[in-house]
Amino acid sequence: MIRFISDLTVLFHAMAGRKKSAMGTTQFINQKMLQEAPIFSKKKIDNSEFKPQHPLTHLVVANNFIVMALANKTLKRRDLEDPTSKEEEIDLKKTIMRTSAKISKLFLDPTGNHLLIAVKSALENDNPALYYLHKTWTQPRQLFKFDKILITAVGWNHAQMDALDIKKTGPILIGTTVGKILETELNAEEGFLGNAFGMTNQVETDPKELYKIEKGQSNQDEKVTGLQYFLSKLNSQKYFITVTTPTRLYQFIGTVPRSDTRPLLAPVFNKYLRGSEYVRPLSELPPSSRKSSSLSFFFNQEKREYNQILNPEKIGWMSELFLFWGGIQANNDDRTVIDPQNRRSIPFEVSGSEDDIPRQAFITEFHALILYKNKLRGICLLNDQEIFVDQHDGTLVGMAQDQMKNIFWVYTEYSVFKYQVSNEGRHVWRIYLDQEKFLEAERLAQMHAHDQPEALDIVRIRQAEKLYSDGKYIESAMTYAKTKTSFEEVTLKFVDLEDKTALKNYLKKKLENLKPSEATQSTLVIMWLIEIHQNQLGTMRQCGKNSDDQKKMYQSEEKEFFLLLSLPQVEKCIKENKEVVYNLLGSHGDMRSLVHLAEILNDTERVIRYNLANKQFDKVLELLASAGDQRLVYTHCHALLSSDPARTVDRLMTMDRVDPLKLIPAFMNVTQSNPEVVPHCVR
């Protein structure tokens, strides 16, 4: 009896396994980054592009449109999208800037069309003010309905970004120093509400207070430091709103039955005002930690389609003590949009020095840029690893993000630097791999296959190893089959397992991937598969097929084996090694499979011999009649006449192409040895 498995086991145990690298992920990534272009490439804006004569106090950028505020109460702006455009300068001293007033903050919408200028005074008796400057205007206009209100955050209408009317903002949210959230709309068109209301040239609608954030732990009003709202791409009536204060991060989720409702977002906040939903912060800091707070989002702009809603994929909130980030779920959960399985906090080192207090942070898909007094840090969100530190000689005034272009701008009083994100996920697959997040690792490895062709194989090998160690042998085998791991190394892992299903599945998958030129290995794999199937069928036969379940299991295994034999690649191999396969099947006593194989190979003579041995003469006669090979008739006529003369002669008389002269030897031999046959032969 042939036993391929035993022989191959000895062979594979004699082969040496591969050596694995001991290099850690962090060490590997750091070495690679020294050789490659940086993830965040830095460029200082040339003096020909930017020539500040006075200190720079504020800078905002959106859709390649940059606006800068200078200490001499002027604005500079330029359309970076148009290389022929020139820098515009707007003098604010005559229009909005009193002697004691200064710009508190600039707010530019993601399209770059709408700019809000918050102004405050150093004098206690002077009220704050808010001004609006459209991209097409040369002077800002005061929004009188926001007198005495110092705004600290703006939630722009992202659903308006693809609107053809660039002079309307749609509903926007306004956050204030005392924790109020207001809603208004801006319209740059002349005569917005018309003379009928006595408010010609009014730009803003009446601001409506929708909500007030509760006081902090020290019983003081909490100013709104970050504010954004989004319409769900899955539900055209569902909105989610994110609000941050110096110590808290909130989310509000609700539906708006009609998009023409004004104020639009009142229904979302109303359910929290009624108490039907309890507002509790997602994250909270002790009351002493109140110096820094910034909110940011990551949008995958590559997925943006015209006139289609693009929701952010990640949220980031920076406080003095930590950076919180989370993935945003695209589902219909009314409790949270932040994925509880994909969120974490990255703590900051607390030294007490002002130099070490983070001032601003923006997140990308996998990283965060954190601004300090005189340095910019880049860290990986997935493992907290610091990827760079950019030290600056002067004090860094601030940082801005161009959300549409995924570009970051850092500025001092007299310098501006641009940081461009480039291929930031190039090594992230290794981080996911170390965290055993194989689906994410495989997705990113596939994305970077052009510059890291080995990545996908590394991921799959590690996944296969993990599945094997967890006892998931079939899944492990199928994963190994997708790798370039040597055939010997993989089979060595599975050959000693009592259940050969995993090995069988691996061999089948391996067979699918073998090239026609690899005939020797194909033959080895096919023979091994036949042996495994035969062992499994033999074990089932020995255990019996008494119950229905046993019968079904046997039939299923046999069907799977017959399917293997019918594959063109297998059939070709068997034809070239026919006797070996017949002997193998015969050694297991599996005549059904042997006959089935002979039928597949059109090996009629072998089938005839099998049926003669089992006295199935009718089947033999049918085969002879249908085969059309008269040689087989002459060869087996003697045996048939001896065993069943009547039916044999009946069938012979129907075969027109049989030569009677060639039947005479068989007839004479039979009649001489058995005279009882004569009446059937002479008619």
Model-derived segments and spans:
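Extended non-globular scaffold/tether segments
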Residues: 252-262, 267-587, 591-598, 604-683
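N-terminal amphipathic/basic-hydrophobic helices that include classical n-h-c signal peptides
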Residues: 1-14
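WD40-like beta-propeller blades
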Residues: 12, 16-365, 371, 375-400, ...
